[in-house]
Amino acid sequence: MSLIIVYADGACRGNPGPMAIGASIQTAEGVELSTVSALLGQGTNNLAEYGAAIAGVRKAIEYGTDAIELRMDSQLVVKQLTGEFQIRKADLKPLLNELLTLIGQYKAWSVTHVRREQNQRADELANLAYGY
């Protein structure tokens, strides 16, 4: 297996409020290899989105592939990763750096903004952490 795909989604009830994350780690053919579903404590939606991406990529690293594609419905995280958006909130900068360090372990990486409907599995996993 040379490519692994991570669908990641963060949720926040209240913004700020209790955060949850979900990630689905899949083969290029769409076979789910593993999942992440967890509560993160109090924070914002953007913190949750970064938390989901970081947790998903950490899990994906276990599979030892050469390439990763991160798919998220958070336009902010995607555009900050690609350098299209600057970071205005100081609390997001270390998370961006951590995420870049993690995906930098791959020979090739990409990040894609997907519609919410395409990220449904990760959303389900985030809601599962809330007990829904």
Model-based region annotation:
Residues 48-49, 118:
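Hydrophobic (often cysteine-bearing) scaffold residues that line and stabilize catalytic clefts
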Residues 11-15, 54-126, 130-132:
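RNase H catalytic domain
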Residues 1-47, 55-62, 66:
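RNase H-like nuclease fold core
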